[in-house]
Amino acid sequence: MKIVLLFWFSGLLFLSAQTTTNVDNYINAKEYKKAKALLLKEIQSNPSTTVKSKLADVYSYLKEWDNAITLYKELVVAYPKNADYHFKYGGITARKAQSGSRIRALGLIGTIRNSFIKASELDPKHVNARWGLIDFYLSVPIIFGGSTTKAYRYADELASISPIEGHFALAYVYVNDGELEKATMQYLKTLDYIPNIKKVERNQLNYLIGKVSGDYNQYVDIGILKMKDFIKNYTIKDGVPLSEAYYRLAKLYRLKKDRTNANIWINKAIANQTNFKQAIVERELIETL
């Protein structure tokens, strides 16, 4: 009897592992509806943390904010010391706030702020949580808790975790604070780190490296690789529209005087966003090659 049960239980584990593999393949292929269907079936018999987390991620990719929030909240309650769950809960709540009315957004401010703060407290090296707090304090009006001073503080914390992230963060805050010369100085400092960049864990950093490479015409080949990585790994959580990445990649190819590839990517940018003025200007520059 024990042998029969063992084989039966092993079969369940295999099915679960196979389903997880299929889900990962669908997610990598950006076939989120197929991933969702598999996970909804799997969660009926296997409501594990892994399945819930993956389903919450898929809901967020599909912009099903309420469904994602429900699952992330369950995970936060079940694992209150998991920094990533707090961050994701705050991040998805922020996306819901951005997609609705200002009145609804005001009611979510506390949840967003507290989730990011909790994540940063639980993990002193949590890069995404600090970026979330920087965005939060720069986006929210002062009367509702916005604070440039606090944004600078978290940018400084990022600098102690990762110098290149810190310089990008400080540049971002300076731009929002109208300190463009100081922002430029921070962007220039990021260039010192680019030649030694190996694996990039945070996809938004791929975009920033590609952007600064194009803006200052430095390390263009690396910039192209990183921007392609950003596009390949892109999800809605990355924040920057794909049209912007296509435009940046076209600009990088123009700097290499590669008209063929520049045209491919600038056309993708304009097809993705027809009124993209910067991309239209870039296409005119490409035509002069």
Predicted regions and their residues:
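N-terminal leader/linker segments that initiate helical-solenoid repeat arrays
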Residues: 14-63, 287-289
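"A position-specific structural signal for the A-helix of alpha-solenoid helical repeats
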Residues: 21, 54, 88, 95, ...
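TPR alpha-solenoid repeat register
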Residues: 51-52, 85, 129, 166-168, ...
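Residue signature of alpha-solenoid helical repeat architecture, marking inter-repeat boundaries
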Residues: 46, 80, 87, 107, ...
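Structural marker of alpha-solenoid helical repeat scaffolds
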Residues: 44-45, 78-79, 122, 158-161, ...
